[in-house]
Amino acid sequence: MDKNIIIGAMTALITPFKNGKVDEQSYARLIKRQIENGIDAVVPVGTTGESATLTHEEHRTCIEIAVETCKGTKVKVLAGAGSNATHEAVGLAKFAKEHGADGILSVAPYYNKPTQQGLYEHYKAIAQSVDIPVLLYNVPGRTGCEISTDTIIKLFRDCENIYGVKEASGNIDKCVDLLAHEPRMMLISGEDAINYPILSNGGKGVISVTSNLLPDMISALTHFALDENYKEAKKINDELYNINKILFCESNPIPIKTAMYIAGLIESLEFRLPLCPPSKENFAKIEEVMKKYKIKGF
């Protein structure tokens, strides 16, 4: 298997709601907008997609919509398929594979605090259950669980279809250490604030929140960096500084959904509790920053 298969500029899709349900028409339109603006892959039902509060039926529907919308294009679908119960993660991975996803993104098990051996066995079971690429997802700030460098490398070497890791720990030193010990690994940035540092230190892509709003800029940044044109990549990164900062003024995906609503890209500013709309103060701050960016709605 080609372990390079899903890299480049990828978008962690939001999940739009309308009257308490997934707004399927808006979801498909959002994905089409990504396709039209140079994104290499979309990532449905991850953290940004509020996967934790979707029903299993909604989770499956979002994957099906993403696959159907991307059919016949060059854009790949890297489907969220994580759980803190291994059997459930395996089931989600199998569903994604059977319904046409090109690969899966699997978050580290949260809440139950597994050992490194437990993490290894968890991911090995997932990898053995499907024959599509698997990207590990390390985000200890949300899961309370850190996948160690040694465990990531062991999984990469032992499991043919585990091709890399989405790193959202904010730890650049860890990223550099990973590539120093296993340069074949595909390191993917999971934080917009450090996309450029990761790409300029050997990273092979990003899974971006900001690209929901500005897919063309994230695509350009990523591809300039992958082509080793770091001057142009840095220029775009600097232009994105203010929007990247404001899009994390509250818990993701609250600010990005708010920005999408302000831009007219989604019809309703709805969340699933316990997430809720931003404070009036932060809404105004998001609106102010967005005036600097030319963003068109539907």
Curated annotation (Swiss-Prot):
One of its GO terms (biological process) is diaminopimelate biosynthetic process. It comes from the Bacteria. PROSITE patterns: DHDPS_1 (PS00665), DHDPS_2 (PS00666). Keywords: Amino-acid biosynthesis, Cytoplasm, Diaminopimelate biosynthesis, Lyase, Lysine biosynthesis, Schiff base. The record marks T47, Y111 as: Part of a proton relay during catalysis. CDD domains: DHDPS. It is an enzyme of class 4 (lyase). The active site is at Y137 (proton donor/acceptor), K166 (schiff-base intermediate with substrate). Pfam families: DHDPS (PF00701). Pathway: Amino-acid biosynthesis; L-lysine biosynthesis via DAP pathway; (S)-tetrahydrodipicolinate from L-aspartate: step 3/4. Pyruvate binds at T48, I207. The keyword Hydrolase does not apply. GO terms for cellular component: cytosol. It catalyses: L-aspartate 4-semialdehyde + pyruvate = (2S,4S)-4-hydroxy-2,3,4,5-tetrahydrodipicolinate + H2O + H(+). It is found in: Cytoplasm. Its EC number is 4.3.3.7. One of its GO terms (molecular function) is 4-hydroxy-tetrahydrodipicolinate synthase activity. Catalyzes the condensation of (S)-aspartate-beta-semialdehyde [(S)-ASA] and pyruvate to 4-hydroxy-tetrahydrodipicolinate (HTPA). Homotetramer; dimer of dimers. NCBIfam families: dapA. Belongs to the DapA family. This is 4-hydroxy-tetrahydrodipicolinate synthase. It comes from Campylobacter jejuni subsp. jejuni serotype O:6 (strain 81116 / NCTC 11828). The lineage of its organism: Bacteria, Pseudomonadati, Campylobacterota, Epsilonproteobacteria, Campylobacterales.
